[in-house]
């Protein structure tokens, strides 16, 4: 298999208003499954959507926040209070409580990993994403030899956990192709995560057999009406199929699943609540599952002038991260390189437990002899190497951990 590179001249980076209007008329129903998509029912989806719609964060008071902080085990209503505007004046107390929970369950440990982007072909039209199919960027896909070179280079840094990412193209990045990448990764790493397009339970089972341990799926926004306006075409347009991806992954034998909304696409408080409540419901249904959260904020991407993000400032980001910790004390929380090193270092000293290092969002960026790399998905704000992040953690009296899994 040869490396494939393509300069996508299919369309201008942003379609004309006339074409957009035409697409609006011809959009498929975002709530109806496409042929081949596994339908596992809507039990959890219905609960999440109902609770999110009923969540009026402006009704919560300082007394509600104090009550939530006083509890040792927190209910969904406590979680709602901690995410409300009324909680902001208590941010210092919330951060202290979150830090205590983090130290109680994780000690000073902070887990390190890095992502590897093996392809950036995409068949979706998500208007906020740098990889979307209409964006005029360089496309690339690594072959097996190049994947192995990249992973060998990453392993030399001392990292033992890898996150494999592709663009959302079943045609270019087939399940079999991703499976081969997992098999290669198993030679070098103890923990393998996937951030790929959602697949069916049997396909997750196959990827698990190939070596994958956990799956992260970003719902982007849980507001189905907003979701419909942001995802104009492609398989990602189907809202319920994406919401149920984590449960299908668990049915397929994955050890853990990750959740995340792209904060800033819609009302961040409602999206943060829906994300946490979704994870909470799955944890209750699958008690063995390892739960993880990511908390990305919308970042600038190539050729994007259509999104006007609802501002999520640093205090609000801290509020979300701490609320996750207090509501789901055993969950892993990752801080994205979308954030600058100051913010990331502060968050891991309080509530986050996982941090990426040596990050590139381009294709084939770890080995110099892989030419014509594909474009990055988004801009990163923390470009520190593995050693630099490692040393920064030590300076904060934290213990960098490469892996705590042993295979026997």
Q: Which functions belong to the PLM regions below?
A:
Residues 106-146:
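Canonical Radical SAM [4Fe-4S] cluster-binding loop centered on the CxxxCxxC motif
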Residues 142, 173, 177, 233-241, ...:
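Alpha-helix N-cap and loop-to-helix initiation/capping positions
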Residues 201-207, 266-280, 340-350:
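Catalytic cores of alpha/beta
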Residues 114, 151, 178-182, 204, ...:
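Generic structural signal for well-ordered alpha-helices
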Residues 1-87, 284-408:
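Auxiliary Fe-S-binding modules of radical SAM enzymes
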Residues 98, 126, 164, 217, ...:
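Conserved, mostly hydrophobic/aromatic
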């Amino acid at each position: 298999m040869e490396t494939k590179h393509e300069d996508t001249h299919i369309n201008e980076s942003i379609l004309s208003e006339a074409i957009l209007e035409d697409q609006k008329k011809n959009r498929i129903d975002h709530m109806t499954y496409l042929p081949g998509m596994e339908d596992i029912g809507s039990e959890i989806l219905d609960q999440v959507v109902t609770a999110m719609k009923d969540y009026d964060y402006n009704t919560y008071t300082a007394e509600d926040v104090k009550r939530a902080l006083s509890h040792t085990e927190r209910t969904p209503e406590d979680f709602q209070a901690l995410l409300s505007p009324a909680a902001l004046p208590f941010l210092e107390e919330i951060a202290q409580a979150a830090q205590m929970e983090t130290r109680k369950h994780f000690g000073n440990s902070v887990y390190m990993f890095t992502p590897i982007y093996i392809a950036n072909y995409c068949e979706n039209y998500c208007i906020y994403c740098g990889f979307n199919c209409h964006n005029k960027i360089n496309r690339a896909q690594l072959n097996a030899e190049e994947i192995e070179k990249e992973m060998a280079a990453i392993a030399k840094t001392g990292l033992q956990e890898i996150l494999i990412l592709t663009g959302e193209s079943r045609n270019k990045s087939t399940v079999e192709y991703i499976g081969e990448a997992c098999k290669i990764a198993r030679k070098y790493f103890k923990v393998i995560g996937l951030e790929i397009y959602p697949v069916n339970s049997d396909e997750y089972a196959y990827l698990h057999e190939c070596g994958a341990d956990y799956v992260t799926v970003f719902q982007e926004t849980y507001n189905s009406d907003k979701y419909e306006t942001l995802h104009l075409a492609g398989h990602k347009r189907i809202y319920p199929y994406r919401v149920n991806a984590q449960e299908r992954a668990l049915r397929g034998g994955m050890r853990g699943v990750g959740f995340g909304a792209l904060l800033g696409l819609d009302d961040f408080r409602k999206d943060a609540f829906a994300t946490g409540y979704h994870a909470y419901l799955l944890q209750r249904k699958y008690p063995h599952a390892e739960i993880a959260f990511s908390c990305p904020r919308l970042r600038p991407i190539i050729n994007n002038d259509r999104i006007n993000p609802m501002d999520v400032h640093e205090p609000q980001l801290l509020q979300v991260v701490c609320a996750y910790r207090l509501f789901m004390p055993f969950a892993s929380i990752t801080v994205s390189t979308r954030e600058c090193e100051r913010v990331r270092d502060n968050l891991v000293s309080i509530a986050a437990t996982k941090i990426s290092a040596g990050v590139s969002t381009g294709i084939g960026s770890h080995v110099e002899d892989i030419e014509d790399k594909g474009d990055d998905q988004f801009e990163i704000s923390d470009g520190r190497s593995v050693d630099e992040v490692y040393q920064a953690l030590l300076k904060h009296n934290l213990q960098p951990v490469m892996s705590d899994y042993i295979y026997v």
